[in-house]
Amino acid sequence: MRPLTEEETRVMFEKIAKYIGENLQLLVDRPDGTYCFRLHNDRVYYVSEMILKLAANISGDKLVSLGTCFGKFTKTHKFRLHVTALDFLAPYAKYKVWIKPGAEQSFLYGNHVLKSGLGRITENTSQYQGVVVYSMADVPLGFGVAAKSTQDCRKVDPMAIVVFHQADIGEYIRHEETLT
C-alpha cells in the first residue's frame, strides 16, 4: 500500500474528471474527514486517513482490500474505473443519461445504450464525454461514454448506439469473484 506517484495521480484524475469535471475537488476535500487514494496490487483505493492509520500495522501481502476500489491500472499504465466507484461518481456527475425501464436490463447485462432506450440526456453533452447512466427513477446504474452529442441524439435512428457501456451494477453479480 503506497501513495500514488505524480504520473499515476495525473492519469487517474484525468479519467475521473471525464465524469465529474471540476467536482473532483469535492471528492478530495470532504467535510466529513480527510480521504486519500492509495495503490495496492495495481488497484487504486479511496480510503479515509483514519482507516489508513488503523491498517498501517497490517503487512502488504496479507492486505486484500482497504476502503473503496476506484479502479485499476492496466499493464500499459492506463486507468480503468471499476463499478465500485459509482457511489462516489454519481452525486457529482456533470453529464447524465437516463434510460427507459425496457433498456435497463440490457444495460445491466453489459450492452451499450441504444437511442430507443434513451429516456433523457443532459444538455450540452459532447461526443465521447463520460456520463453516468441512471434509471428513470434516478437510481445510478453505471457509467459509460457518450457515443453521440446531445444534438446528434435527436437526429439518429432508434437502433444507433448513444452510450458506450463502461461499467454497470450488474458486474457485482457477473464478476463477483474478481471485484475487491
Swiss-Prot record:
Protein localization: Nucleus, Nucleolus
Q: Major location, coarse class?
A: nucleus
Record region (C-terminal domain): 93-180
Q: List the disulfide bonds.
A: none
Instruction: Decide whether keyword Membrane is in the record.
Output: no
Concerning Pfam families, the annotation shows: pre-PUA_NIP7, UPF0113
Cellular component, GO annotation = nucleolus; preribosome, large subunit precursor
Q: Where are the transmembrane segments?
A: none
Q: Which InterPro entries match?
A: NIP7_N, Nip7_N_euk, PUA, PUA-like_sf, PUA_sf, Ribosomal_synth_fac_NIP7, UPF0113_PUA
Q: Where is this region: N-terminal domain?
A: 1-92
Which GO BP terms apply? ribosomal large subunit biogenesis; ribosome assembly
By its UniProt entry, which SUPFAM superfamilies does this protein fall under? Pre-PUA domain, PUA domain-like
User: What one GO molecular function would you report for this record?
Assistant: RNA binding
Record-annotated PUA domain positions:
94-170
* Keyword vocabulary terms for this entry: Nucleus, Ribosome biogenesis, RNA-binding
* Domain of life from the UniProt record: Eukaryota
> What role does it play?
Required for proper 34S pre-rRNA processing and 60S ribosome subunit assembly.
Recorded family membership = Belongs to the NIP7 family.
**Oligomeric form and interacting partners:** Monomer. Interacts with pre-ribosome complex. May bind to RNA. Interacts with NOL8. Interacts with FTSJ3. Interacts with DDX24.
UniProt protein name: 60S ribosome subunit biogenesis protein NIP7 homolog
